[in-house]
Amino acid sequence: RGDEWFSYFETTDGFRVIKDEAGNYVYALWGADGKSALPTRIIAHDPLSREVEEREFLKNYPKDEQEKIHTRAFEIQNQSNAQQRIGEMTTHTGAPSIPVILVQFADTKLTETDPKTGYEERLCRPATQEEVEVGKGSAYQYFVDQSLGKFTPNFVVIGPVTLESGYAVYGTDVNGQDANVGQMIVEAIQKAVATEEISDWSVFDNDKDGLVDAVYVIYAGEGQHALPMQTDLIWPHTFQIENRGLELPEADGVKFNQYSCSSEMMRGKVEGFGTFCHEFSHCLGLPDFYRTDGLSSSVFTMESWSLMDYGSYTDDSFRPIGYRALEKAYMGWITPIELTEATTIKDWKSTDRGGTGLKIVNNVESSEYYIVETIDESGWNKGAFGHGLLISYVFLRSMEPWYNNTVNNTNPPRVSIVGADNDLTTLITGVNEDKYYSSLAGDTYPSPNGNDEFTDSSTPAATIQVGFLGLQKPLTHISYDRAKGTVSFDFMGGSEDNILTGVVAAKNTATVSEGYYRLDGVWLGTEKPEIPGIYLQRDVHGEMRKIIVER
């Protein structure tokens, strides 16, 4: 259990275990320093497999041991919060250049014959909508589409470079944390600079503050997020070098600090770019939407509906779920519309196709609201398990939990999905995958069980935490037009005199989301090229197609 900051292992009924010198998982007790775990001699089993000695041991197991684990997780989280505020990179528009360093270890090499070409294919190139929908998109296209062309990052792949030591030197856990991962990042940067592939590293300082905006490291082999029992692997994460207590590397007058990293492999296969998009989104300012405090939780948050939860893994990470309206609004890519009076909404598009989110705000507490959006069956939504109207709940009185990456370390959570069928099954890997993914199909409105309304008295209901009179802003007659990929509904009873339909989010004039590209991704402008050849054309709806200009 855990994340990049603190991880530990426990039995299915919550007893902490640790690996002893013989390689057995035994019950653990905290040391006197309150920071390190000590092994007992009792080998751990799940409840149905325990013998008498083990059961007797657990009868006397100190009741405060689990609380100590949670306290330690909280201490580490607070320490990381004090050091790291999500969102070092403030550039959310334009075409910033971001270095991506491919890293091999002395004992583990990247598996592809030509890894640089492979990562340029997965990260850097423009992709058509058709390619996106069959899992052949790219990280570049992901951010272009989420931003409606406002943000077109230029990922520059460097390497591979080979580090001096094996992966375990950098990844072995000490008291639940990767001990030397910072050294991996510094060494990777130093070796990348030494290759002289980049003639001027200052091009990566897009805001001219003397720091490379962000550097991304992709390391060979598996990550501990996929194989948590293998404690010598590295967790994908985003952090700062200075907060690892290391001197900042420097090249061409700029220093390196903010970084992200993730693994090449995911359970035996080359991973797509979902985790890459997740970690890079941390650099841009998005938090995790799962619990980050080490506590067990059966509370449904954003789950597979958000890139910042399980949604990064859709289609083996080759078709990560698109940004939710809340996430796009934070980036400044869309501006949600608040519904305040009786309105009929017709043919509402997804935010990927130019629509926007609709906010329904608690009149008593403006920081508590619902945000609704359309999930269609195209582009990055193609892999979604449900389609129709998706409703998210938000209650953020302060942005501190967002910046400190503790958004959903509360019960109830601050940001979560409303399941239309009222089935909020949480994922337990290896136990209930089929039930979990089946339940996601019922999260959107109208649900498979026929629920087409969201009111103070519906199931689920439009509940609020602040106020006694309820939300009093019902959504009724919710429908989804599969052919159009749009949603319609009545707000507060609807109104023939107040109809909202097909609103398109504001876009930059003549951005790279519209117009013509060369096949290598260079934007040529909005006028059709005159030189014969094959080009990519993106229309005002963000859809791309190949064209041929003949002599």
Can you say where each PLM-predicted feature lies in the sequence?
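Zymogen propeptides/activation segments of proteases
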Residues: R1-V254, R353-N498
